[in-house]
């Protein structure tokens, strides 16, 4: 059936194939299918992608070969382990076209970043046109070397060890966020969020529950906070849903907009 279709239609159909294993199989089916692979727009590497890998070639290089064969990759999701050097190489090719990037960083061990070359967080700076960035298992004790991601509207970080200056620097590099999600983050003591376009914000800080939060986002509609003892929300006429939780049992909330004081 596929063999009877015009090349343009075959390319279009196969461009929606995103699982790395399926892409590799397609390369072996026929030359025609292999020639369609450069038109793939999304590539996904599951956690188990290289569990049974016995070859001499490093998984980073295998990923690189697949990425470098694609003309304009828009989405890259990598759950399999990788190095900072590998990520830097991938993004040197695909960074300008990427719109969505999701990475399982696995760099919560502090000495790991000292031995593997480029810091993974710093490498992300090459993907300047990102619209969505999702990170898992992040060590952010130093400010990432990021320029501004002007097109980034969604930032999600799950499972992280952070320090206040590093988090503040990361948020400053994402001035146009509309959605911010920080879940399972340790080490944060005081955070100030000043994002004029932010509409949804979900924060979950691990620790003693004594973190302080100052939020200046006039368009905020949904705010969910866990682990803060002091919260200040500057004027907002858009707040619709609010959820505050603190296992320590103590929290103080200040809202500068008297119209929403009844929420508390």
Where in this protein do the model-derived segments appear?
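Short, low-complexity, polar/charged sequence segments that are solvent-exposed and flexible
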Residues: 152-155, 174-176, 199-202, 221-223, ...
């Amino acid at each position: 059936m596929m063999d009877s279709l015009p090349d343009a239609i075959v390319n279009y159909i196969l461009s929606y194939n995103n699982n790395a294993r399926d892409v590799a199989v397609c390369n072996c089916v026929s030359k025609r299918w292999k020639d369609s692979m450069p038109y793939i727009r999304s590539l996904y590497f599951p956690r188990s992608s290289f569990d049974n890998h016995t070859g001499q070639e490093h998984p980073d290089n295998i990923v690189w070969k697949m990425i470098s064969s694609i003309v304009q990759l828009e989405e890259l999701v990598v759950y399999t382990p990788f190095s900072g050097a590998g990520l830097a190489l991938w993004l040197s090719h695909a960074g300008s076209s990427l719109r969505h990037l999701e990475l399982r960083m696995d760099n919560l061990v502090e000495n790991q970043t000292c031995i593997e070359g480029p810091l993974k967080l710093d490498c992300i700076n090459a993907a300047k046109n990102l619209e969505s960035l999702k990170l898992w298992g992040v060590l952010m004790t130093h400010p990432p070397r990021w320029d501004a991601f002007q097109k980034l509207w969604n930032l999600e970080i799950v499972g992280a060890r952070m320090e206040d200056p590093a988090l503040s620097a990361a948020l400053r590099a994402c001035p146009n966020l509309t959605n911010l999600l920080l879940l399972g983050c340790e080490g944060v003591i005081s955070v100030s969020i000043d994002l004029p376009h932010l509409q949804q914000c979900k924060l979950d800080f691990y620790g003693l529950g004594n973190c302080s939060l100052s939020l200046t986002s006039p368009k905020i509609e949904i705010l969910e906070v866990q682990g803060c003892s002091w919260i200040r929300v500057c004027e907002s006429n858009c707040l619709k849903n609010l959820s505050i939780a603190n296992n320590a049992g103590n929290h103080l909330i200040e809202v500068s907009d008297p119209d929403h004081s009844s929420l508390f």
